[in-house]
């Protein structure tokens, strides 16, 4: 038996045979053509065909579909392909392959992680175009029995084109928790590991994937295999029991009800919010609209996304957090100056107040969309009342502009993310100025502990259960309640069922977690008491 450690991007257990998947990057021979007009027309037909494939594969509202469609319809990719066909008189397939390689190299040279993810978009789109131009199929066949798929890297399209019932788990070398493939694996609900050194001769070997510990067991011995088969059976039974809670309220044993909301990072997660029975969206991270692109999103693009959220949620609350860029989320086109310590630098609301044109465009989009549902707006990384003063001034300007143009909007609830020690100490004063508070425990923990949560050297020392953090949470809840304002927790700690009863006894009004954690947290609430016996 061999043991390999990776990083788990979605929990769960899988037992089965490995299918090693090797992606073939199309190598197209240089081929000159005499009829440039026909070759250009063939490229246009291929674009139309691929657009139809993307629609069927991803659906209308998928962010991946939108990004690839944007590449397909306009921008440097299409211009480069057409220019190469016309000036060098080469085949459309060769022009696509060459442009793919050049654009991918450009992205590799960038330091922004989110832009590097676009390499997958370019590669997948190019492979589809080349397949259509060559009359080939892009479907991936897994065989007769369900498998654990092992690959160097995977695109979301490759996962979607596989039969979901044939996928037990996904293990890759490249990727991250926020990579396209990891998100897609989470969406279809299968365990996923990244950062595992994959070898081709694993094909056909028996394996166990532990998505809780990030471990892959190759050729497990009988004792380990029996242990995991029993755990897998228990896990499946647990899932069936949890699904029975979908339409149940989150009420404690002593009759106290709290709200359970979902955290989502893009529009692809909207269906999961409804499927798992969340009461709404407690945190919509809006960074997905700003990362992985070449320029600022237009106001109408933002508006359409928020309108979709409002309409999908209908009467359910949906809290949109204004863009939280900086630190580990950089957008190259913004030309943010390099900082010695970006985690402590110009990020979140600080960057928004520096880039007022960007900030106002997002606020206009949010308020315009508010007419279509039950929205709220939330501001990240607040550390002073002066920031609230400036936000209120800008918001008043935005509302006045909408009124002048006769554009409908609602006076929606306003919230602040309490995620800095400064905000904790000023939580009473902040609560006096907003409608409710949300505790962002991820950043609050790292700022309180003075530890970068992504620093591997501090992994063993980083403890977000530290009593200092719990005392801060309790303080915020007490201070806000003195002002008759509700408090929600929307960081990773909200999904930690070991702390559910602790938070309930502190008096928290609601928890907001990733959709897949809604049911486990609901179960934990229903087994807890708010008052001590």
Question: What are these model-predicted stretches?
Answer:
Residues 239-533:
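Conserved alpha/beta-domain cores
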Residues 127, 183, 304-307:
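Residues on a specific face of well-ordered alpha-helices
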